[in-house]
């Protein structure tokens, strides 16, 4: 309805063949918050979990002109010379903070967290995500936990599991927010990854999941999330999962 109505058309934006809710619109944020409230009010849930895809990915040629640029130009942030990147992060911050506040107002025991992409440099890029990760990690106003998707092995050529984990744990300076590490069970036993060394690791090293849990524990993480459920039961990953379970008991 929004996309077809002239008054609300900007609530839903078309970009590269897809339709997106516009985070810069208060009506959009209210819709999402109300959806979360409906769940927490009517169902006995332990938590609300979200991925972090709030904005599409832009390029250097359109980052300042595409998508919600019209809302940015009309904003006080534009008038005060703040960048569109700062504006977009602020829209996401407002949404996340409103969700957290709504959840806690209904039931303080319900947990709210977000599972961002594992590469912090991508999260802080000018062109995508617009996740204010350092603020979220070091404030009690946005999330109860962060669960980075560190879906790489120790042998990844650029994003090695240990180095990425170290960076996340260092970023969580205040300890106000729990850090759970997302583990890629779906890769175990498969010939997958970036480069021959990582592919070999996932395919042949039945200890890879166990070693990731042991390493992250040593660095002080608060827990783990395993993606995805079906691969905890699959034949392909069975050997790695069996060894993983031994360090989870």
Regions found by a protein language model. Name each.
Residues 138-158, 168-249:
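Substrate-binding cleft of secreted/luminal carbohydrate-active enzymes
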Residues 1-42:
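Active-site-adjacent "subsite" loops/lids of carbohydrate-active enzymes
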Residues 49-57, 81-129, 176-186:
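Aromatic-lined carbohydrate-recognition surfaces of secreted/lumenal glycan-active proteins
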Residues 1-15, 52-79, 197-201:
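Aromatic- and acidic-residue-enriched segments that line the glycan-binding/catalytic groove
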Residues 27-39, 124-141, 161, 201-217:
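Short, acidic/polar
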Residues 49, 58, 105-106, 111-147, ...:
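Substrate-binding cleft/loops of secretory-pathway carbohydrate-active enzymes
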Residues 21-23, 74-90, 121-123, 151-154:
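Surface-exposed cleft-lining segments at the edges of enzyme active sites
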Residues 32, 39, 48-51, 103, ...:
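Conserved, mostly hydrophobic/aromatic
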């Amino acid at each position: 309805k929004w996309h077809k109505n002239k008054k609300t058309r900007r609530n839903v934006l078309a970009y590269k063949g897809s339709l997106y809710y516009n985070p810069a619109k208060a009506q959009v944020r209210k819709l999402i918050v109300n959806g979360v409230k409906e769940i927490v009010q009517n169902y006995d849930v332990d938590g609300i979990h979200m991925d972090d895809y709030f904005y599409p990915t832009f390029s250097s040629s359109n980052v300042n002109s595409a998508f919600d640029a019209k809302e940015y130009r009309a904003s006080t942030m534009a008038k005060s010379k703040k960048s569109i990147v700062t504006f977009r992060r602020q829209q996401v911050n407002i949404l996340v903070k409103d969700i957290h506040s709504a959840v806690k107002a209904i039931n303080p025991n319900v947990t709210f967290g977000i599972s961002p992409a594992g590469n912090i440099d991508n999260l802080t890029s000018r062109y995508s995500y617009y996740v204010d990760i350092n603020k979220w990690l070091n404030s009690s106003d946005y999330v109860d936990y962060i669960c980075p998707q560190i879906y790489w092995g120790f042998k990844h050529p650029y994003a090695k599991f240990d180095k990425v984990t170290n960076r996340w744990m260092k970023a969580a300076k205040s300890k106000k927010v729990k850090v759970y590490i997302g583990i890629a069970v779906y890769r175990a036993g498969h010939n997958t990854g970036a480069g021959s060394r990582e592919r070999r690791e996932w395919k042949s090293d039945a200890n890879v999941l166990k070693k990731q849990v042991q390493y992250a524990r040593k660095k002080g993480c608060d827990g783990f999330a395993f993606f995805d459920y079906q691969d905890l039961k699959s034949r392909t990953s069975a050997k790695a999962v069996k060894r993983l379970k031994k360090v989870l008991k």
